[in-house]
Amino acid sequence: MIINARSFGEIEIEKEDIITFPDGIPGFEGLKQYIIINNPDEENPFQWLQSVDNGDLAFVIINPFLIKPDYDIVIPQSAIDKLKIEDKKDVFLYALVVVPKKLEDMTVNLSAPIVINGKEKLGRQI
């Protein structure tokens, strides 16, 4: 499957790599399918959560433990149920990065992480 992403041009993705956000992401509730695009520079910790439905929408994300090694979050039982999480090894956490015009003003949202069940390919911002 090929999608046209504004920041990346045409990229080929596999259907099995698509992560479904059943409720969308707050502010983008109508967009439910995303893929994670890894940074080609392995030294760069940023990745992208690219909408499959809208090529113009991609969120910069980062592993929150790279920012705050003692990061601790409790995933509500309702999210565990909706994401069909059965084993914590299937859970991946990401934080949204806010990238303003002045890069030195960049912030990371540790209060509302993205939780992904890698086994079921389901995601949710909590």
Tell where the protein language model's regions lie, with residue ranges.
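Short active-site loop/helix that positions an aromatic residue
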Residues: 77-87
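Extended catalytic/binding region for NAD+/ADP-ribose chemistry, centered on the ART fold
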Residues: 70-75
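Long, compositionally biased stretches
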Residues: 2-68, 88-126
